[in-house]
């Protein structure tokens, strides 16, 4: 596509850092959960660049929920790619905010029980209701 020179990726700590090995673009490593805030600043400073985040569920749906919702609410001109595997994948497969009901993890060996653990956080459905959000899609 020839857009490598015009693209900046923001990836936080965790599984997302592996993306550096596969895409030959400029990358910024963000503090855990802060990728949308960093991406917002980078885009405002470089309005002609394509800026995106690449985040796992521990980063986006746990520690970074506020940054994600507020970036969407402000209508920031960034793309957020959310890799949701339903667990904290890099630290041993623990239950994450997105772990599905009944899903077995290393910290809930009998499956997620909503009476004990609450409901899974449905990020796509949450941000699609935010007025500043432009486009939401779920892929598998």
List each model region and its residues.
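Conserved thiamine diphosphate
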Residues: 48, 96-140
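Short hydrophobic/aromatic-rich motifs at helix boundaries and adjacent loops
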Residues: 9-13, 40, 96, 122-123
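Active-site-proximal loop->helix
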Residues: 65-70, 90-104
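Structural motif
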Residues: 7-9, 49-52, 77-81, 125, ...
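Thiamine diphosphate
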Residues: 13-89
């Amino acid at each position: 596509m020839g857009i490598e020179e015009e693209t900046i990726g923001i990836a936080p700590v965790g599984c997302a850092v592996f993306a550096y090995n596969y895409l030959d673009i400029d990358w910024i490593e963000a503090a855990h959960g802060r990728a949308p805030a960093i991406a917002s600043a980078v885009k405002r400073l470089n309005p002609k660049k394509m800026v995106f985040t690449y985040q796992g569920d521990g980063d986006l749906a746990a520690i970074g929920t506020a940054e994600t919702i507020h970036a969407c609410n402000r209508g920031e001109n960034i793309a957020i790619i959310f890799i949701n595997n339903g667990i904290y994948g890099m630290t041993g497969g623990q239950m994450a905010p997105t772990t599905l009901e009944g899903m077995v993890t290393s910290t809930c060996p009998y499956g997620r029980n909503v009476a004990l653990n609450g409901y899974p956080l449905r990020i796509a459905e949450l941000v699609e209701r935010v007025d500043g959000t432009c486009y939401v899609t779920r892929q598998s």
